[in-house]
Regions:
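Class I SAM-dependent methyltransferase SAM/SAH-binding core
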Residues: 61, 67-116
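Acceptor-substrate binding/catalytic loop of class I
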Residues: 160, 180-197
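A short acidic, Gly/Pro-enriched loop at the edge of an enzyme's catalytic core
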Residues: 115-126
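A short glycine-rich, Lys/Arg-flanked "PGG" loop and its adjoining helix->strand segment in the class I
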Residues: 140-152
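A C-terminal cap/extension of S-adenosyl-L-methionine-dependent methyltransferases
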Residues: 101, 178, 200, 204, ...
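A short SAM/SAH-binding and catalytic strip from SAM-dependent methyltransferases
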Residues: 126-137
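Conserved class I S-adenosyl-L-methionine
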Residues: 2-54, 155-179
Length: 253
C-alpha cells in the first residue's frame, strides 16, 4: 500500500503535457477533448456541494483545476474559488472563460505545483481535487500539502480512478485505445489510486476519511460506448460501484 504514496516518475508513461495543448477547447462541452469532464461535472459539483455544505462566502481551493470547469461551477454555487494548476495555457483558457462570465469576481487562478502550494497554513475553508490524484506520482506529499492549507474543521473532497483491472480496461483500453476519446498516455495504471491507499495518505496527513462512493455513467454499457464514440453524451450518478471511479471526502480536526 505504501508504494503508491510515492511512485518513481521514471517508471510511469503518463504525459500530462497533453493538457497544455487544449487551449479554449477546454470549454467544448460535447465533442471536445475533455467532453468527459463536462459530462461528469454536474454530478461531481452536486456531490461536492452536498458534503462541503453551504458554499456562499466560503474560500475554496481547486487543486489541479485545468481549464476551470469545476472551479467555475463551484463559484457559481457561491464559493470564493482559487484554482491552481501547472499548465499555464490551461489557466489562460480558464481566465478567458471566467472573464466573460458571471463568476469573474469569485474565481481566480494561479500557476502552482500541488506539491508546493504557495499558500499559508490553514488558508482555505474547503479543498476539492477532481480528476487529478491519478496524475500525481507523489500522492503522499500532495495530500500533505492540501491538508496543510486546509483550515481546522475544513473538508477535502475528491474524485479519482481506482486501480482495478476494470478501470484499466475502460479508462485506458477503451477510452485511450479503442474509441480514442483520450490521448494515449494521459493515464498510467500504476498511478490509479485504491480507496485504501488514499485513506492511508489522508490519515498520514492528519485527515479523517468519511466516505467514498462510486461515480458511474447511467444506462446500458454498450449503448454508452456508442454515445462516447459519437461525442460523450452521458449522464453520471453517485453509486455504490467504485470499481472504476470514486469520489469522497475527508475532514480535518
Amino acid at each position: 500500500m505504501s508504494g503508491r504514496l510515492s511512485v518513481d516518475p521514471a517508471r510511469v508513461t503518463i504525459d500530462n503535457r497533453y493538457y497544455d495543448d487544449i487551449g479554449d477547447a477546454w470549454w467544448q462541452t460535447r465533442k471536445g477533448p475533455v467532453a468527459g469532464l463536462h459530462a461528469m461535472n454536474p454530478t461531481r459539483a452536486g456531490y461536492f456541494e452536498k458534503v462541503l455544505g453551504p458554499l456562499k462566502g466560503r474560500t475554496l481551493l481547486d487543486v489541479g483545476c485545468g481549464g476551470g470547469i469545476l472551479a467555475e461551477e463551484l463559484a457559481r454555487r457561491g464559493a470564493d474559488v482559487t484554482g491552481i494548476d501547472m499548465s499555464v495555457s490551461s489557466l489562460a483558457a480558464a481566465n478567458r472563460h471566467a472573464a466573460a462570465g458571471a463568476t469573474r469576481d469569485s474565481v481566480r487562478y494561479a500557476a502552482s505545483d500541488a506539491l508546493a502550494l504557495p499558500f499559508a497554513d490553514a488558508s482555505f475553508d474547503a479543498i476539492v481535487s477532481s480528476d487529478f490524484l491519478e496524475h500525481v506520482p507523489d500522492l503522499g506529499r500532495c495530500v500533505r500539502e492540501m491538508a496543510r492549507v486546509l483550515k481546522p474543521g475544513g473538508v477535502l473532497a475528491f474524485d479519482t480512478i481506482n486501480r482495478t483491472f476494470l478501470a484499466w480496461v475502460i479508462v485506458i483500453g477503451v477510452m485511450e485505445v479503442l474509441v480514442r476519446r483520450i490521448p494515449r498516455h494521459t493515464h498510467d495504471r500504476r498511478l490509479f489510486v485504491k480507496p485504501s491507499e488514499l485513506a492511508s495518505a489522508l490519515s498520514a496527513a492528519g485527515l479523517a476519511l468519511v466516505e467514498t462512493r462510486g461515480l458511474s455513467p447511467e444506462g446500458n454499457p454498450l449503448a454508452n460506448l456508442v454515445r462516447v464514440a459519437r461525442g460523450f453524451d452521458l449522464r453520471f450518478a453517485v453509486t455504490s460501484d467504485q470499481n472504476v471511479s470514486y469520489l469522497g471526502y475527508a475532514t480535518k480536526a
